[in-house]
């Protein structure tokens, strides 16, 4: 079992991969996930070529059963998750009048609901250990809306509120929760 495991959900081509590289350089075993896990091959090869450890997976973070099983698998097969990062954004511009409820819900589901699922599931493991870090990446949309981004801003505000609530609840239990606007 690995000593330090960093989970990055939303390990995309930009920020998520950069986060994975930083934790890998600090000696963490990386567990990188995104909807299409095969797109993580380049990141995995890069981390391994620098003597790091990286596991890559496909995961739809909006599906509760999948997230629950995924977190259990990591804890059982790879090691205790020390740090969990939720980096899924869904930054899509939709005019409010033309935004269907389906589009709004999908953006919220990716940015906010998936964050809740990951946060809850990793907290179930971290709380008994009385240690761990949960990081939610945000955007300026987390603190103010912008024309054409009602769905994105609403979801980002929700993720920020989730992080604040989790920090107050889990902080006294040894879990650090942060919402980082990038």
Give residue spans per PLM region.
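Conserved glycine-rich Rossmann-like NAD(P)H-binding loop of the short-chain dehydrogenase/reductase
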Residues: 28-42
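Active-site loop of short-chain dehydrogenase/reductase
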Residues: 3-4, 80-81, 126-139, 172-175
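Catalytic loop of short-chain dehydrogenase/reductase
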Residues: 133-158, 164, 168-171
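A short, exposed helix-loop element centered on a Lys and neighboring polar residues
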Residues: 119-120, 164
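Substrate-binding pocket helix/loop in short-chain dehydrogenase/reductase
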Residues: 95-96, 103-108
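Rossmann-fold cofactor-recognition segment
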Residues: 47-65
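Conserved glycine-rich cofactor-binding loop
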Residues: 12-13
């Amino acid at each position: 079992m690995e000593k330090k495991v960093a989970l990055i959900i939303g390990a995309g081509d930009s920020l998520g991969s950069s986060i994975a590289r930083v934790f890998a350089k600090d000696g963490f075993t990386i567990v990188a996930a995104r909807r299409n896990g095969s797109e993580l091959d380049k990141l995995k090869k890069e981390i391994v070529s620098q003597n790091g450890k990286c596991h890559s997976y496909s995961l739809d973070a909006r599906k509760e059963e999948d997230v629950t099983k995924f977190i259990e698998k990591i804890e059982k097969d790879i090691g205790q998750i020390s740090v969990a990062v939720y980096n899924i954004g869904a930054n899509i511009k939709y005019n409010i009048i033309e935004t269907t409820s389906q589009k709004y819900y999908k953006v919220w589901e990716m940015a906010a609901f998936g964050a809740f699922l990951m946060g809850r599931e990793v907290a179930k493991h971290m709380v008994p250990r009385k240690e761990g870090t949960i990081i939610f990446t945000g955007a300026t949309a987390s603190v103010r809306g912008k024309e054409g981004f009602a769905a994105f801003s609403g979801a980002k505000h929700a993720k920020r509120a989730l992080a604040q609530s989790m920090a107050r609840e889990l902080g006294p239990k040894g879990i650090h929760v942060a919402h980082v606007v990038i």
